[in-house]
Amino acid sequence: MSNQYQTQGYTVNDAGRRLIVDPITRIEGHMRCEVNIDEQNVITNAVSCGTMFRGLEIILQGRDPRDAWAFVERICGVCTGVHALASVYAIEDAIGIQVPDNANIIRNIMLATLWCHDHLVHFYQLAGMDWIDVLNALKADPRATSQLAQSLSAWPMSSPGYFFDVQNRLKKFVDGGQLGIFRNGYWGHPQYKLSPEANLMGFAHYLEALDFQREIVKIHTIFGGKNPHPNWIVGGMPCAINLDQSGAVGAINMERLNLVQSIITRTADFINNVMVPDALAIGQFNKAWSQIGTGLSDKCVLSYGAFPDIANDFSQQSLLMPGGAVINGDFKNVMPVDLADPQQIQEFVDHAWYRYPDDRLGRHPFDGITDPWYNPGDVKGSDTHIQQLNEQERYSWIKAPRWRGHAMEVGPLARTLIAYHKGDAATIESVDRMMSALKLPLSGIQSTLGRILCRAHEAQWTVGKLQYFFDRLMTNLKNGDLATANTEKWEPASWPQHCRGIGFTEAPRGALGHWASIRDQKIELYQCVVPTTWNASPRDPKKQIGAYEAALMGTQMAIPDQPLEILRTLHSFDPCLACSTHVLGDDGSELIAVQVR
C-alpha cells in the first residue's frame, strides 16, 4: 500500500519503482539513498539513510576536556581540523578562557586553508567527474582546447602542446584497459553536456588540482604540525614563533612564514584562474541544472557564521562570514541564531535508530541523549540485510535536527544566501557577477548547479581572507607580539565545579556546533551537530523531509539504472571519501556498480 502526503511544498509518494543506491559515499559514516520514481522516471519520494553509528559522544564521557579536540577531530579526515576548532571553542567557552590575538588569527588561517583545500578537492576530485566526461575528452582538439582555456583566463598551462600531452596520457590509460578510479563512471550519459574540449580542459585541471592540493595543506603542517588532523590546544595554538632563527627546535621562523605566503599566492592564482573559470564553464553548458535540486534552499537555510575578526568575540559584528536563519522562504527576514536557546535547535529521533524518554519530543543538544537503538521495523529483507528501508518507521543512524521546528539546508549555498540577503557587499558583487556571466536569474543559484557555483565563490572569498589574516599575523609579529596561547587556566584546579560551553563555526559543508558540559573536571556530556546531520536528516514527527531528500524530489532521471542525476545533486552538498556504490533493484539485486568520486 502506497503512502502519499504533502510536506514543505512537495507531494511525497512512495508508489512506483524503488531505486536503491548504497552506499552513496562516506560522509562521517556511510550513506544509503532510496528513491521512488514514477512512469516518467521522476523522483516522487527520497529516503536518506546514514548507515554507520558514530558514538564519539559516548566515548568522550568521563574524559579530560582538554583532550576532546583530539578525539572529535577524527570524525572527519577531509574537513580536517574543523571539529577540533569547534571543540576548543566549546571548552574555552565553558571554562572562560580568553585566547591571544595571534591564536585567533592562526586559527582563522587554519580554517581558511581548510576551506580552500576542501572546496578545490570537492570541485575536482569529489564532484568534478559528475560533470566532466573523461572518455569524451579523447575526441577533443587540443588546439581548440587551448583556445578555450586561454579565452577564460591567463593560466599559463594552456598551450596546445600541454593539452595534447594530457590527452595522450589519457589515451594510453584507456587503451591499456586500466581505467582505475574512472572505471565505473557513467561516461556517455546524456546528462554530460560539456564539449570534448571543455572535458579535456576539465580533466587536465582535475590532474593539476590533485597535485596542487598537497601544497595547500602545508600551511596546516607549519602551524599545526601535520595534516590530516593538525594539533590544537585549549587556550590557543601549540606553535611557538621565533623570528631570529634561534631558540626552540621546531619554532616557526621567517623561512616557514615566507613559505606560507608563497602557498597563499599560488592558491589564489589557482582558484582565480582555474577553479572559478571551470565552474563558470560547467554552468554555461549545464544551465538546466539551475532549476534542478532546489530542495530546501528556497525555503529554509541556516548558517552559524565563522571567522571571528576579534579574538574571543563571536558576535555577528565580529564574524566575517555572517550567520543567520531563513524559514518559509522569507529572505527579507534573516533571523539571528542562538545555539544556547532550547527552542531553536532541537534533535528528533522518532525516525532514527536512537531512543529518548519521549521520542515525539525534540531535545536541545545540552539535553541531548545518545542512546543507540537499532530497530529497523518492518523492512524488506532482514535486520542485518535490509533490501528496502521503511521510512514510515526508523531508518537512519542520523538524528533529525530542526531549527524552530524546520528542516534546514546548510553549506556554501546556505551561507551565500544568508550573506547576500544580509547585504554583504563582497558576496553580492561576486554572486551577481557569476549569475550575470551565465545569464541566469538570482533564483538559479538555489539549485544543484548553484551549490557548485557557491563553492567557487567561497573559495575566491576565502583565499582573500587567508591573505588578510596572514597580513595581520605578520604585523603583530613585526610589532613584537609573539604570544600564541594563554595557559592561565590550563590546570583543572582553576575550573568551576560545573560549567557548560558551546563551540561553533562553519565547516566547508556547513554549520557545525559542539556542546560540552563539564563536571568535576571531566566531560559529563558532549554533543555534536554536524553539517551532515542537518543535510542528511531523516524525517521528523511532522514527516518533514531533510535537505538531501528534498533536493532529489522532482528530479527526472534519463536512465534510472545509471543514476547520475542522484549523484550530481547529493555530491553538490559535498561528499567526502571515495567508496564503491551499488545500484540495486527493488528486489535487492545489484543492477550496476560505480565508483563514487
Predicted regions: what they are:
Residues 2-597:
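Metal/cofactor-centered catalytic core regions of large enzymes
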